């Protein structure tokens, strides 16, 4: 019998902060299960979830506006600890009898918070001391409004020069509010504060660990599918690979993986997928060579969005055909992860909503009435990688840079041809190999090569030749929403360029993309 890893759980209500998913990830890192719901959740839903504690996130709205979001009143009547962060603190203060005002002085960035009163939330936590021995905390502020009066049964725990109520608390009810972001690394003791709230105040055990998550997933898969057969589209990417390994552990040969080789993969990737999952791990894999079919469908097409749609359509067609060949398959497995599940709400604020499946694979034939198995749907990407390591997948495969779903179809600009893909594969492999050799691969967030459908004059021996151009692209980013181009050493870039031009017959020029995002996107198409 596996432990109930969902026994202790934190509910995070989202008011629209860009950091809300980070709050959830931090709670998970503490070994505690949590879910992220929209702020306009009902009392019945909260009761059914039965949280051990509730966190109210930050948000971009102003609590002083008439129709701004509010926490359900039941949050403060449920008898569990509540932790308000920024906007969450402000709405808590207002709803419980305090006062919030817009501030002329927007506080954004580092601040030092002076601790005035002892509190269970920060007891023994400090970054430095004042001259008279009071604890100081280095925190990250991001707010315009501020609490100007706290509810009558709260005490002021800490303040800054411009923010009189930086931390407030009602120790009896276990309600806490902070006017800064404990979830970001800039708040140096933020993780300790979250740990204090989740583990000590809410008394949650650290049950959410990779080994226990695997045991729980295996048990749930077996309970869901029994002795039925399951099909999975295996791409070799992180999510589908970890899904395959979990299902294989749970049901063994009752899993059939369909690997569609579309001719748009990286150098030797198809062989690596078959060797690793077929030969090494012993999974049941159907290898479908479909390069000609994909390239034929893409012939003559230059528009990036049209190319994406063609690749998606042909994949579904090929997968459907293979699925129909298998007998008695009752379940379709997908590598849906938790961020896929968090979707925009149809509520007034458009905040994150949960509980709706995001389907990665398109419509299966209507005659195939299959159930859906999504063993990763509670997990963030970093958790999926940790699970993969625990299941024996290699680190280099789990932590390699992102690769687009359409593959080289969007890294060959314009029309996609086999000749272009073959040249690009080899050039890209050289770039990645050199990054690894120079210990630069893990220092950049994403690196790849782009094929440009233009010929450039080159000199080879005593003759001139017109051959193709490729661009190297490497970026540094935290969230992939914005990115800086990576300042790779000139000597390194020269070495990569020389190797590509000398070793890949058909490429005469190598350029380096120095565009940031924005205005450019990370991928060229």
From Swiss-Prot:
Cited Gene3D superfamilies: 3.30.300.10, 3.40.50.880, HUPs
Record-listed ATP binding positions: 235-241
GO cellular component labels: cytosol
Catalytic reactions on record: XMP + L-glutamine + ATP + H2O = GMP + L-glutamate + AMP + diphosphate + 2 H(+)
Domain GMPS ATP-PPase: 208-400
GO molecular function: ATP binding; GMP synthase activity
Domain Glutamine amidotransferase type-1 intervals: 9-207
Quaternary organization: Homodimer.
Pathway terms, separated by semicolons: Purine metabolism; GMP biosynthesis; GMP from XMP (L-Gln route): step 1/1
Residues annotated as the enzyme's active site: 86 (nucleophile), 181, 183
Designated name of the protein: GMP synthase [glutamine-hydrolyzing]
Pfam families xref list: GATase (PF00117), GMP_synt_C (PF00958), NAD_synthase (PF02540)
Keyword Magnesium set for record: no
KW ATP-binding (keyword) present: yes
Keywords from the named record: ATP-binding, Glutamine amidotransferase, GMP biosynthesis, Ligase, Nucleotide-binding, Purine biosynthesis
Tree of life domain: Bacteria
Function statement: Catalyzes the synthesis of GMP from XMP.
EC number(s) given by UniProt: 6.3.5.2
